[in-house]
Amino acid sequence: MTKYFGTDGVRGIANKELSPEMAFRLGRTGGYVLTQHKEDASRRPLVLVARDTRISGQMLADALIAGLLSVGIEVLDLGVITTPAVAYLIKIQGADAGIQISASHNPVADNGIKFFGADGYKLSDDTEEEIEALLDAPEDKLPRPAAEGLGTVDDYPEGALKYTQFLEQTLADDLSGIHVCLDGANGATSGLVSRIFADLETDFDTMAISPDGLNINANVGSTHPQALSKFVVEKGADVGLAFDGDGDRCIAVDEQGNIVDGDKIMFILGSYMKSQGRLKQDTVVTTVMSNLGLYKALEANGMKSVQTAVGDRHVVEAMRKDGYNIGGEQSGHVILFDYHNTGDGMLTGIHLLNVMKKTGKKLSELAAPVQDYPQKLVNVKVADKENWQAYPEIQSAIDTVEKEMAGDGRVLVRPSGTEPLLRVMAEAKTEDLVSRYVDQIVDVVKQEMGSKED
């Protein structure tokens, strides 16, 4: 069976791999599968559809919606809105599913189609495979109703207001007295940030909130926070917040222009939650890519951590399974389960500002306990990435390095999820040490697996 779904929905270059024809088929198959499980059989199935600001978004949305309508599904078109807004509104509207058309932080030529179930969570592997089986079927045997059996579509701009009200209501007090610079990445947050931060009574300046269909994520946003860093210093602001194209990430900048990544944000929010007696099991959930500096800071401040595989989906799964209420990734996906079930950049941002206001501390002071260890990552081309652990010499090289580190560094070796690469990463006290450690392991990988560096 063809694997259409990646770690975050179906992605590709818009109008090529991700064509309008594919979007139509995803509407039919995905809509059909997701609405077969609805609890109330007496009403028509309802699906929410939204998109980010990419030029290809309208084309793919129209094709996707046509597919949904063709199997008798009612559609609420939310227009341009963030991914976490879709996840929230599914539950508020009592919808059977939600679909976001976005490639998140990727370049403008890319796009993606991301599905959420009736519970507002991303789909399980089993559900994705059910959709993939229908996509691969030699013949489309899904229903083709006529006349009154067809679905209808309604625009629903009110969704944005409901979502912004939800965000504002997660705070007990306003954020007056804070001067913040906001970078909308020319993406889905562009039309929302001014409303929210005005309602919360901040003093704010904005950049990258004028999308033209082509400038999403272009040298701005959470993957390029350097522009915001300069903007914060120019404006003399207390803090800057950079979002990504679909609004599920947030990277901050302190008053000196220093970047405060997802690791530091999780530490700041987790520490404050602990001080308020709200950090469940005194634990923060991270992925294996979080910096050793975060783990050292958590331990020094009486907190524990749980590590998952890379991807916010794995973080959410661990949080649901064991009852934790904060987790995330270095990239700025932060999940605050007390309020929402998915990463939400604006939710993260306003709660970071709330900690600044409640503690009276500057962001640089709040982030200071997390001292990043120098990190080096080398990708090595290999023929059989999944079986690297079968080579005892590689494991021996890792053991030797870890013994030298004596707890003051770490090694992570893992296969790439999409390419024939083995990723060798290490963190240590100094740049020289980390380079030596990585090179030691990479040399053995090349020797044992007959590979060459990409």
Curated annotation (Swiss-Prot):
Keywords: Isomerase, Magnesium, Metal-binding, Phosphoprotein. GO terms for biological process: carbohydrate metabolic process; peptidoglycan biosynthetic process; UDP-N-acetylglucosamine biosynthetic process. It catalyses: alpha-D-glucosamine 1-phosphate = D-glucosamine 6-phosphate. Gene3D superfamilies: Alpha-D-Glucose-1,6-Bisphosphate, subunit A, domain 3, Alpha-D-phosphohexomutase, C-terminal domain. Activated by phosphorylation. It is an enzyme of class 5 (isomerase). Its EC number is 5.4.2.10. The modification Phosphoserine is found at S104. SUPFAM superfamilies: Phosphoglucomutase, C-terminal domain, Phosphoglucomutase, first 3 domains. One of its GO terms (molecular function) is magnesium ion binding. PROSITE patterns: PGM_PMM. InterPro entries: A-D-PHexomutase_a/b/a-I (IPR005844), A-D-PHexomutase_a/b/a-I/II/III (IPR016055), A-D-PHexomutase_a/b/a-II (IPR005845), A-D-PHexomutase_a/b/a-III (IPR005846), A-D-PHexomutase_C (IPR005843), A-D-PHexomutase_C_sf (IPR036900), A-D-PHexomutase_CS (IPR016066), Alpha-D-phosphohexomutase_SF (IPR005841). It comes from the Bacteria. The active site is at S104 (phosphoserine intermediate). Catalyzes the conversion of glucosamine-6-phosphate to glucosamine-1-phosphate. This is Phosphoglucosamine mutase. The gene is glmM.
